[in-house]
């Protein structure tokens, strides 16, 4: 008798816990997107584990009707690595913030990415330490004034994309908290990707860093300051879809289609599956006079650490078993 496939709804992933984030915090939106993405992918709640470190975003496991572990500061990636290696059948998610992930947890993060462990890493980036009440973080811009930098920071920030791709990451995406549709789409793609996926979500902290991303998230000028990349599609953006990205020598350039001799044919087509990450890194680093790249920037398949470990264990166990068969024992002693 055939069993009917269960159709999960977003509510199936919601726990009964009161959500304790501040009203207006961007984390609320990301949580809702994750509920919707999981329902879309169809991962059973009992086949999902959500791991986190310490920080505002790291409270998320409490709000998921799944297995979860609220661990210690910066160590979420290490715990998630162990969970996935021990239970490769689970969909394992790492929820982390810019401080938790890139400061005390930086080493665990880059090695989880380098090893290509099949983890879904969601990096909430609000460029501030919110839980400890407003200190600058590893992603805060140079000159940023905070409680721990009253005269402005004198250091340059980490750029999560540069770090993830530099660690040989095979999946990197960027989303914004106010774009629920596309953020849900990205998280669903992250869940389907086999290997380490890193999704940076630009979130707003209404209390300690309000409006930090408004130059690209406000609807008034979002279309002209961001470009949403889709594999196989032209890199076009703008309120009138009249701007595009072209290659000018060894650099990317934003042009207006129909001006200065540029046509639609000159505009680059996004190839998220290209194994060479050179162009992906260039796209991920855009900003300033160039639009900030959103969407799935890189999505490449590669062998995963967790599968390789289990394949190696199986191979070694089979060899050990052979030692205890009579034929193998005879061969071993030369009979």
PLM regions and their residue ranges:
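Conserved thiamine diphosphate
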Residues: 9, 89, 137-192
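Glycine-rich beta-alpha junction loops
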Residues: 54-56, 126-128, 179, 202-207, ...
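Thiamine diphosphate
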Residues: 54-130, 182-184
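Conserved small/polar residues in nucleotide/adenosyl-binding loops
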Residues: 324-329
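Active-site diphosphate/adenylate-binding microenvironment
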Residues: 7, 11-72
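Short coil/turn connectors at secondary-structure junctions
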Residues: 17, 44-48, 86-92, 114-120, ...
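Electrostatically charged, flexible surface regions
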Residues: 194, 203-310, 314-315
